Amino acid sequence: MSLQEKFDAAVEIIQKLPKTGPVATSNDQKLTFYSLFKQASIGDVNTDRPGIFSIIERKKWDSWKELEGVSQDEAKERYIKALNDMFDKIAEELDVAAWLEQIDPVIKTNLALIGK
């Protein structure tokens, strides 16, 4: 399986995660996944920094800007690793296999594709 296919599977997992419940991403995790996604998909920041009153957009832009110079492939690898690390931590407190039986089957399939 190619890096792009693994990355696409990882992105779909993040998009399909429930918004609430035992496996919900924190704001910091969301920011990490956002910036890695942008770097992996587009490359270096290609827009102006949002104004001071656009707090959320500015945080997102700053997080992406921090990845300047990271290759798109490296950003894809980091995205997948961040997702794997997140599930490793979740597995310390939750029966992930049982949880996976209760949610969108695509998540379980895609976790297998990225090596979980």
Curated annotation (Swiss-Prot):
Name the encoding gene, please. acbp-3
Q: Would you tell me the Gene Ontology cellular component terms?
A: cytoplasm
Q: Write out the transmembrane intervals.
A: none
Q: What is this protein called?
A: Acyl-CoA-binding protein homolog 3
What is stated as this protein's family in its record?
Belongs to the ACBP family.
Task: Kindly give the SUPFAM superfamilies that the UniProt entry links to this protein.
Answer: Acyl-CoA binding protein
- Listed GO molecular functions? fatty-acyl-CoA binding
Instruction: Give binding positions for an acyl-CoA.
Output: 34-38, 60, 79
Taxonomically, the superkingdom here is Eukaryota
Q: Name one Pfam family in it.
A: ACBP
Where in the numbering of this chain does the ACB domain appear?
Answer: 3-92
Q: Which InterPro entries match?
A: Acyl-CoA-binding_prot_CS (IPR022408), Acyl-CoA-binding_protein (IPR000582), Acyl-CoA-binding_sf (IPR035984), FERM/acyl-CoA-bd_prot_sf (IPR014352)
CDD domains for the chain? ACBP
Keywords, comma-separated and alphabetical: Lipid-binding, Transport
